């Protein structure tokens, strides 16, 4: 144990005042008690800290009261992780400063953000080459900003909800369509500042603190003693996953916090890695006679993703295309669905391409050849190069979940307890066809209406079950659980990008087992002795 790189040493800091709103002061602030899951929570107090020091003060006060603490920011999550079960709701929405920029010796640019900074703000500022907060930056950051202006960089993680906050995306290891090429949030996080429930602060730099080969690591207590523990021993799924604490040999301890969903500590600041952006972007929509040909096309694209600059592969199945045609018939041009949607297509695949400008014609030619070779309809492909054209295709893609939501909203007028049942599951490459066949067989046998769409490049398809009545809803929920077990049996994850939150805690146990849950809770107790942080998230209350 002479090597202390596996010991984390949080420090006490001078705390700043952070008023807690209670009683009548909470009236009119009900929106903070819910997120996009539509679940409504309760809170004894609400705080809006403006600094790490204020966060430390707020959690110290909550701990003295014995209150649980729930973290919130943009409230874009759909698994109810930001929905409080009493106690203190800690909103980080005022932690909105981009604090600086630095360039490492190897030329990498790292952007220093507070947790409440929105993804949209980061991406827009990078496109503009300027940051509103730069007037307060130090000389090193200003020099790096001047160098940045000669580059074309971006931050790759792209969850569907672009108004998500940086801290929230890190807390659930967010991913999106472009995860196919660039991966999820985790590899782009270089440094974190984290407030623990005792008010002390951890600074975590990637590569600075690694667990031992057997998973052993420690955290220094306030009295100087070391509390020892082990990282989880379960195998991480061979797919994208946002289910539970990360596990890997000699785990970099920063990775415990990425994807921990606000249950180990409160992320207040982060340094995120920027990478070169493609010179030009293009969106392509391809149409297919049947699902088998669409799957063959997907497999071929996987083999050539780097060569062709394929950033995303998204699927829309036959049922979903039929739903979009009905939307077009009902709403016309306002539907966002083009009138030229092929009437006979049995599936569609959308691609995002990022490449060098002078390479784009050749890339599009190779794609057309590939579509023809696999049996698609090259003459019906849609290609969008200009920003406004790509935006129209984006609107078309988002018309599908909007249509699903409108159908559920209509059903809820008669059956208000019904909600959408949408899966968030991924399997390894070799099992894509298998899981699709299982989905269709089980859904047909249950006589449930559904559509399938999503990130086919990562074998991460969303099955959206559309229950017509309470009986359908129960059958759909039972199938949802059955699908989760099947996906785990195939080596996949039942929570690929949205996290576990408070809604899918049983799926986490399906994935890691009883022993895995015990190992995770042991890790949690090292950082949160009284288990007050994120109560009900990951682990059932």
PLM features: residue spans?
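N-terminal flexible segment immediately upstream of the FAD-binding catalytic core
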Residues: 1-64, 76-110, 119, 124-134, ...
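FAD-binding subdomain of flavoenzyme oxidoreductases
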Residues: 99-101, 115, 119-120, 124-128, ...
